[in-house]
Amino acid sequence: FRRVLFRSNKNIKMKNKRKINNTLVYTISVLIIVVITLIAGIFPKAFGMYAQSVYDWITNWFGWLFLIIVFILDVFLIFLAFSRYGRFKLGSDEEKPEFSMLSWIGMLFSAGLGVGIVFWGVAEPLTHYLHSPFPGKIADHSEESARVAMGYTFFHWGISQWSIFAISGLIVAYFQFRKQRNGLISTAMEPVFGEAYKRPFRNIIDILAIIATVMGIATSIGLGIMQIGGGLNHLFDVPNNNFTKILITILMVAIFLGSSLTGLNHGVKWLSNLNILLGAILLIFILIFGDLKFILESYTLAISDYLQHFIEYSLRVNPYSGDDSWIQQWTVFYWAWVISWSPFIGGFVARVSRGRTIREFVVGVLIIPPLISFTWIAGFGGTAIKLALNHNDKLVHIVDKDYTVALFELLSHFPLSEVTSSLAIVLIFIFIVTSADSTTHIVAGMATGGSINPTLKHKVLWGLLIGAISVAMTIAGGLKSLQTASVITGLPFSIILLLMIFSLMRALKREPIHHFKMTSIDDEKDYSISLEEREKQDEQDNK
């Protein structure tokens, strides 16, 4: 009786302690977001200047670190996909995937970087054409700079970007669905630090994951708000001022909170499918009315250049000349942005990938979304470069001055421009809604101890905070403030991503090795122990 009573009291104490820690993580995370929002809203100019200084310092000193870590993630995931560990399911061995393949791909893409690719799909390749990624070596406004522009844009939206999402999503899905643990990043670090590692450290990791996720989505929403504002001004002469941005944000928050009420399976799935339809309509339109031969050839050549220069671009720094400004402005920003958003993608991708094998997960995430991005870039970005090569100075000057109107200015050169531009605005808006909707669900769960289905009040609170900080930073410093938010949170979280590799490998080695039996040679082996235990036995036998 005493033992039962002791265990009961111990369980009650553990539950109370867990509740206190969850409340601590929740409260501190909310306070940090509120403070940043207030500072950006009350002191926008000072915030913008400070953001610029911090961004320059971090990218100057730690740009190399972002490049190395992302390259390591690339190599590790490729190894994992084709290793024996790829057979494990993200769930029980008998479990079937929850979503169909088409719905799974659509949810990955639209909730991942849908708004980003629409924003940069025209602006980035055209900007690289105007301002060469290799200043002094390749002339601006040249055919060679056009070729490099497409290849480099493919690199920024290719495997490297999605490998960051994949590692975070993979480890969360593995622990949550195969090991029946919560979906917190701190829990996924247990194989590295041990299950009993100190609670303050766990709390710090969880708080950092929440802040990073909010900052990452704020960057994406901010880009979307800027582009919608630019599109409305370009089409209908709506003033592109702070008041317009606030109205766009209020409408967005109202819609994605309404979508959250329908639940993840209904709201996000329906909106994701609508995104695919609208995006496909615009892409087919540009393929029909654009130069299809040029688009297909530029796509093919860009794939070739991407594969040929993958390692060079992945680890490109200029220590001898000392000028890394272009790399810091583009590659480092992209990696930091994606890293800061990876806790969200980790949680969301884990949620929709239950029942799939590690191999299926890695191959799907590293191949399908990048190919979709490449197709969009070749269609819209390639068409923009074709117009620029034909000396369309109006498009060049407008995009060089304002990224936000790049897509709309391109569409204005084709029939039905008002219709297609309006569809583009709707597409961007829905991309924002799906991303914010999914993030609200994931962040609310992270802030409440890894809950898969957080309560409505928590989702409403985090939805309001995400909307507020997005518009506050957009107004305070525009693109630079948004970039700084990603870089600041992405730096410490990049170290956590690196540790996740060791965490996942240690966990996989503890799996029963009957999964690894491949030939009759293995018949005499004992499959009742884990691979880690088998290796220890082999070492003892060798001694």
Predicted stretch roles:
Residues W64, M101, A139-A149, Y197-I207, ...:
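Membrane-interface alpha-helices at helix entry/exit sites of multi-pass transporters
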Residues M518-K543:
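Long, low-complexity, intrinsically disordered cytosolic termini of multi-pass membrane proteins
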Residues N11-S145, L261, I284, F502-L508, ...:
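N-terminal alpha-helical transmembrane segments of multi-pass membrane transport
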Residues K17-I20, L24-T27, L31-G41, D74-F79, ...:
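Helix-loop-helix module between adjacent transmembrane segments
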Residues F1-L5:
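Short, small-residue-biased leader/transition segments that mark boundaries at the very start
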Residues K15-K19, P44-I58, L77-K96, A149-H156, ...:
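Membrane-water interface regions at transmembrane-helix termini and the short interhelical loops
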Residues K15-N16, M49-Y55, F82-M101, L126-G151, ...:
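Flexible loop linkers connecting adjacent transmembrane helices
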Residues Y197, F201-R356, V363, I368-S421, ...:
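Membrane-embedded translocation segments of transport machinery
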